[in-house]
């Protein structure tokens, strides 16, 4: 069962503002060190606080900052506020199929600890953390605050994606950039895009990501009418792997959509664009409900709920699952929130207090506004679900109007839909690709091979599609 996040008490706001200011000022002083000429993942400082049940919970820095721009003054320092502490952080796993949502103690005290890892760097070779370490090759995409380039490391020759965020003198560093960097620095998983480096100058903040060839949206556009069932299964498994990893670390992605799921030329799927992500365990005000692209936004958020849990992401998983199989978006609203809800209720039924306890208390739920629909079998709306064993059952457990009824990522990985996959997939380490397991590979889609499609690059669209 999903607990609710408690609002931050007024007397704690001052402390969180101090944390904001300290971390924001420290952001410009990041000194990235490498032990050799290969890429190495970077870590985020984790602070532990006692929660209501007396268990350690994880706080990711910067996630209590209000969603505005943070002014950063450049100074020089070797202090890195994002290094891991020496103490180990305990994680709590859900004991049932429900999504995870933890309450944090209002009396908890934050005490960051920093451990430095020093290593010499070659005085003659370009260094990580400096603009001259990378060569721009071509422009991939552009957003309101950021431009994404395909680039190459001068250290080891590997391709990278350079997300260059323009800093305004008056506005400072965009907050979503700080949030994305602070979270990604601590995430090490094969199914999460890797942040290699951060470069800060007076004019720009550059996030250096691993280079990935395309995204799921473009892949589905290239192969209309639904993907190969075996490929759907492998893509979904990887998506759930990545989500399970971040959810166990109390992080919500909050913006799941095909454009934010990158796909390499070997078929690896990677979660990207963490500009809207949040660490759930941080005491704060309830979150903005303007966070997820409309088609993939869950009904509880559409109805005004701001009490989020990992269940928020699982609705998006269900929508993406159906879209991969059917070849069309599950709920392609054309007008507004009202239209989006009508499309959902047409399939799942108009909710009431019996089917969704508490729905009448949601700010935007007005029964008289909605047509009364009865729920349908999902195959009536999306017939291709009936062609794949156990697909309809899994989709129905993800697409639940009541968030507490949605399957968690960890539970979904154990669903019978995946029963024909090799058992070794569940034994992989976090950084191991599923394609290291024998006989696990993508099948050719109708019309074109994966390799040919990989040449049609859309990576820049995904990285520049954030709020930056």
Swiss-Prot record:
Notes on activation and inhibition: Serine/threonine-protein kinase activity is promoted by associated cyclins CCDN3 and CCNY and repressed by CDKN1A.
GO biological process, one term: regulation of canonical Wnt signaling pathway
Binding site for ATP: 140-148, 163
One of the record's GO molecular function terms: cyclin-dependent protein serine/threonine kinase activity
Active site positions: 255
Entry's localization field: Cell membrane; Cytoplasm; Nucleus
Compositionally biased region (Polar residues): 455-468
Disordered, as annotated region: 103-132, 448-468
Membrane topology term: Peripheral membrane protein
Alphabetical keyword list: ATP-binding, Cell cycle, Cell division, Cell membrane, Cytoplasm, Kinase, Membrane, Nucleotide-binding, Nucleus, Phosphoprotein, Serine/threonine-protein kinase, Transferase, Wnt signaling pathway
Domain Protein kinase: 134-418
Transmembrane portions of the chain: none
Highest taxon listed in the record's lineage: Eukaryota
Gene Ontology CC annotations of this record: cytoplasmic cyclin-dependent protein kinase holoenzyme complex; cytosol; nucleus; plasma membrane
Function, as annotated: Serine/threonine-protein kinase involved in the control of the eukaryotic cell cycle, whose activity is controlled by an associated cyclin. Acts as a cell-cycle regulator of Wnt signaling pathway during G2/M phase by mediating the phosphorylation of LRP6 at 'Ser-1490', leading to the activation of the Wnt signaling pathway. Acts as a regulator of cell cycle progression and cell proliferation via its interaction with CCDN3. Phosphorylates RB1 in vitro, however the relevance of such result remains to be confirmed in vivo.
Assembly and interaction partners: Found in a complex with LRP6, CCNY and CAPRIN2 during G2/M stage; CAPRIN2 functions as a scaffold for the complex by binding to CCNY via its N terminus and to CDK14 via its C terminus. Interacts with CCNY; CCNY mediates its recruitment to the plasma membrane and promotes phosphorylation of LRP6. Interacts with CCDN3 and CDKN1A. Interacts with SEPT8. Interacts with 14-3-3 proteina YWHAB, YWHAE, YWHAH and YWHAQ.
Family membership noted in the UniProt record: Belongs to the protein kinase superfamily. CMGC Ser/Thr protein kinase family. CDC2/CDKX subfamily.
Name the UniProt record assigns to this protein: Cyclin-dependent kinase 14
Organism: Dasypus novemcinctus
